[in-house]
């Protein structure tokens, strides 16, 4: 109202300004015209010039009037255009205000319904619980990741220690092999030296034998030459034999000692070789044992993996069968529910119709009895008021007819009032149903909006029953629906296993 008053005042002000401008323009034009006439009067002296002046003045006046008419028309057109613009702006402002008011009103109604809706509050509580579950699952997953990383580090450490141990064992084997090779080379060199010594001794013995033969030959020659020296030669020969025997004894003793030493060295070499062989056999046995353990572990892991794969395949097959059974059961339950709903609606409609008919009969009977009682009461009241029994027959009949018409009029008024009351009750009930339908529609719209806003972020953590049916799932894309169906089938199969 205030905006309309302001707009009217603005239009009046614009109109006054336009009128003042027009009056100012006329005044200035008159002044110019008077000045022009004065100049013409001073300049024109002859009659011809006066006539010419009058003719020019008439032309000027006509031109001036024409310009004035055009200016007035332009002013009026401008004023009408401004008025139309103002009216259009006013209508637009009113329409914008109405739209804003309706929007605020709708938003307040929606907010009130959201705050008072038990269903939306329960949905928000379920979503909050889902967010908490997602947070807990994320924490558990993080702990599992840390645990897995720690196990991975421990396993890597164990593998590194095993590699270090194997490398140390290989290095020890290399060192033992090198020592064995050095001892073997030493033994070979020692045997070579012994062989050289034995060869040298044999050569010395052969030289001794050669010398002995030469001595024998000299002795024989000396014996032949000088019989006197025979005894001496014999003594020398005896001495030589003793020397040979002693040499043989010493040689035999040395040989025995050397053989004993060589046997001892051979025994030690053989013992070392046996020890090395036992170590190699033990190492190979340990390697074979590790290989057998590794092979057994690999076979066990392969068997376990195959078993788990078979279990997963069986579980997947059971999940698929369970999902198909659930789909069939869901379709069957849906059909049964639809049938039950239709039967229930039919029974409710039939029961409602019967109740309405019975109620209508009761109301009609009560209304009829009430009307009869009302008629009798009003007739009795009118009769008592007019004392009909004291009138003659004609007046009494006239009065009774008058009373009857009055009662019928009252009954008609009561019927009209009854009908009006029923119509008002029907309108109120319809209005209440409309408000309830509007409230349910807003609740459903807000519920779907909340689901679309949060469900994609909580996939895998949504509680059961948060979706009412396929209509809710159709709010999302195909990927979300497939993931949701798969997770629901997994949960159902896990429950079945448990």
UniProtKB/Swiss-Prot annotation:
One Pfam family this sequence matches: TPH
Keyword Ion transport: no
Residue runs in coiled coils: 45-211, 270-348, 385-450
InterPro entries attached to this UniProt entry: MNS1, TPH_dom
Domain of life the protein comes from: Eukaryota
One GO term (biological process): meiotic cell cycle
Cellular component GO terms held in the UniProt record: axonemal microtubule; axoneme; motile cilium; nucleus
Keywords of this entry: Cell projection, Cilium, Coiled coil, Cytoplasm, Cytoskeleton, Flagellum, Meiosis, Nucleus
Entry's localization field: Nucleus; Cytoplasm, Cytoskeleton, Cilium axoneme; Cytoplasm, Cytoskeleton, Flagellum axoneme
Purpose of the protein: Microtubule inner protein (MIP) part of the dynein-decorated doublet microtubules (DMTs) in cilia axoneme, which is required for motile cilia beating. May play a role in the control of meiotic division and germ cell differentiation through regulation of pairing and recombination during meiosis. Required for sperm flagella assembly. May play a role in the assembly and function of the outer dynein arm-docking complex (ODA-DC). ODA-DC mediates outer dynein arms (ODA) binding onto the axonemal doublet microtubules.
Family note: Belongs to the MNS1 family.
Record's protein name: Meiosis-specific nuclear structural protein 1
């Amino acid at each position: 109202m205030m905006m309309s008053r302001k707009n009217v005042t603005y239009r009046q002000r614009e109109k006054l300004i336009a009128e003042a401008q027009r009056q100012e323009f006329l005044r200035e034009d008159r002044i110019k015209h008077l000045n022009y006439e004065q100049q013409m009067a001073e300049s024109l002296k002859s009659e011809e010039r006066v006539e010419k002046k009058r003719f020019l003045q008439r032309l000027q006046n006509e031109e001036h009037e024409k310009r004035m008419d055009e200016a007035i028309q332009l002013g009026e057109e401008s004023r009408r255009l401004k008025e139309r613009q103002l009216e259009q702006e006013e209508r637009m402002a009113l329409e914008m205000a109405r739209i804003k008011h309706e929007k605020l009103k709708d938003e307040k109604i929606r907010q009130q319904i959201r705050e008072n809706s038990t269903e939306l509050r329960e949905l928000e509580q379920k979503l909050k619980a889902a967010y908490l579950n997602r947070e807990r699952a994320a924490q558990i997953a993080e702990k599992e990741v840390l645990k897995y990383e720690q196990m991975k580090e421990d396993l890597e450490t164990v593998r590194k220690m095993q590699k270090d141990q194997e490398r140390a064992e290989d290095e020890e084997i290399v060192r033992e092999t090198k020592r064995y090779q050095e001892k073997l080379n030493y033994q070979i060199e020692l045997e070579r030296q012994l062989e050289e010594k034995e060869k040298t001794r044999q050569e010395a013995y052969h030289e001794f034998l050669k010398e002995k033969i030469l001595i024998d030959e000299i002795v024989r020659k000396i014996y032949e030459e000088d019989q006197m020296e025979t005894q001496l030669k014999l003594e020398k020969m005896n001495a030589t034999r003793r020397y040979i025997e002693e040499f043989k004894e010493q040689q035999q003793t040395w040989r025995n000692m050397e053989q004993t030493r060589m046997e001892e060295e051979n025994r030690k070499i053989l013992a070392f070789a046996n020890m090395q062989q036992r170590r190699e056999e033990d190492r190979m046995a340990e390697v074979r044992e590790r290989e057998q353990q590794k092979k057994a572990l690999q076979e066990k892991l392969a068997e376990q993996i195959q078993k788990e794969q078979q279990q997963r395949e069986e579980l997947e097959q059971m999940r698929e069968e369970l999902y198909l059974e659930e789909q069939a059961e869901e379709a069957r339950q849906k059909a049964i529910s639809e049938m039950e709903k239709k039967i229930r609606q039919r029974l409710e409609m039939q029961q409602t119709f019967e109740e309405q008919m019975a109620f209508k009969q009761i109301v009609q009977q009560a209304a009829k009895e009430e009307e009869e009682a009302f008629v009798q009461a009003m007739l009795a009241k009118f009769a008592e008021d007019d004392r009909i029994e004291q009138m003659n027959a004609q007046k009494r009949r006239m009065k009774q007819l008058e009373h009857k018409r009055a009662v019928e009029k009252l009954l008609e008024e009561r019927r009209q009032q009854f009908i009006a009351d029923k119509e008002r009750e029907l309108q109120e009930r319809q209005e209440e149903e409309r408000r309830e339908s509007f409230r349910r529609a807003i609740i459903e719209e807000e519920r779907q909006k909340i689901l679309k806003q949060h469900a994609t972020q909580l996939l895998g953590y949504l509680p059961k029953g948060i979706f009412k049916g396929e209509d809710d799932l159709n709010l999302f894309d195909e990927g979300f629906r497939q993931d949701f169906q798969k997770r629901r089938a997994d949960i159902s199969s896990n429950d079945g296993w448990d």
